[in-house]
Amino acid sequence: FQDPMMGTAAGMMIEENLAIAARRGKTPGLKWSLNEKDHDWFVEMLKELDLGLENRMTAKVGLLSGGQRQALTLLMATIKRPKLLLLDEHTAALDPKTAAKVLSLTERIIDRDKLTALMITHNMRDALKYGNRLIMMYNGRILVDVAGEEKKNLTTQDLLLMFEKAAGNTLDSDRLLLG
């Protein structure tokens, strides 16, 4: 969810968005309405975000900041514990401080729920910091594939050199790789 404005229903309340996510895969029926048990569960989940959203359950999602919406979207995506969580540049549209908070939240949720995640990013620092395996692609080909201790000991400069060696050329834009 590259765009924090996607993944949620802007005209609906926070608790309504969470209710839709919680009922994903179920047949809609008369018991689909929000109840106190769901409300309490949603409040507890939102408290973990530490964004104050638990006190704004009836606020329209369209009134939230990009970071708040991205955090809410992450909660909605993981509420049913997916087999694979695909994160496609999920912090790209956020300022650095908010991106760091969303990445920290992402890491907590993945660790807590023991999720398998695939994070796509152009930010090499994030690629090195998060996850247990790093794959770099160029023109549809895998050029770098590192894991474990090898990944843990790499620096951004090491990674750039590995990539340049595998690609057979130097890169034009450090911004592309450094984020």
Report residues per predicted region.
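Q-loop/switch helix immediately C-terminal to the Walker
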Residues: 10-24
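H-loop/switch region of ABC-family ATPase nucleotide-binding domains
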Residues: 121-122
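Conserved beta-strand-loop-alpha-helix hinge in the C-terminal portion
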Residues: 141-167
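Helix N-cap at the start of a conserved alpha-helix in ABC-type nucleotide-binding domains
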Residues: 96-98
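Helical segment within the ABC ATPase nucleotide-binding domain
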Residues: 100-113
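Catalytic Walker B motif of ABC-type/P-loop ATPase nucleotide-binding domains
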Residues: 85-88
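ABC ATPase C-loop
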Residues: 77-78
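Conserved catalytic motifs of ABC-family nucleotide-binding domains
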Residues: 81
